[in-house]
């Protein structure tokens, strides 16, 4: 069980990180199915890989930008059994980068919706190892300046931008 402290932004486009001291870590497709507001299932697959990873996760919000997340690896059979109770789902492609200058991991999620046809780009940075709360993050952390041209809004405190709220009902 880990305490998660993160900030989230909506982006206009995927940032060009070349020449900005970022190291590409991985790309993966994530399907999140919700059993309740705090309980979800995840399938994670990497491009070109046939193996999928299955997780059962519980995430409880404890403050603005803070939550406690418990994650357990499960089998495909366990996933399929639990998935029968899922009622919302979200699919995203995540690209993860390490900013060598500040040591933080930047996750850029591309969410693509069919009806209505909308694409949303979200960027998250997790801070739990360095800062205690969002006030401290806002006081001491500076997002690299070149991100200014890519950011539409800081949506950390907007529940409408939680993955749960963005998920669509399963048909």
Locations of regions flagged by a protein language model:
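Phosphate-end processing signature that detects enzymes handling 5′-triphosphorylated RNA
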Residues: 1-171
């Amino acid at each position: 069980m880990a305490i998660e402290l993160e900030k989230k932004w909506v982006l206009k486009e995927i940032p060009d990180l070349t020449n900005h001291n970022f190291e590409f870590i991985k790309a993966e497709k994530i399907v999140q199915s919700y059993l309740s507001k705090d309980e979800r299932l995840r399938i994670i697959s990497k491009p070109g890989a046939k193996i999928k990873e299955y997780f059962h996760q519980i995430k409880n919000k404890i403050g603005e930008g803070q939550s406690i997340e418990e994650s357990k690896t499960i089998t495909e059979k366990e996933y399929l059994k639990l998935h029968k109770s899922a009622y919302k789902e979200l699919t995203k492609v995540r690209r993860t980068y390490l900013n060598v200058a500040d040591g933080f991991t930047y996750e850029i999620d591309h969410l693509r919706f069919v009806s209505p046809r909308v694409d949303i780009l979200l960027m998250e940075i997790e801070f739990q190892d360095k800062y205690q709360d969002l006030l401290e993050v806002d006081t001491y952390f500076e997002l690299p300046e070149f991100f200014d041209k890519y950011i539409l809004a800081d949506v950390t405190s907007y529940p409408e931008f939680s993955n749960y709220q963005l998920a669509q009902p399963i048909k």
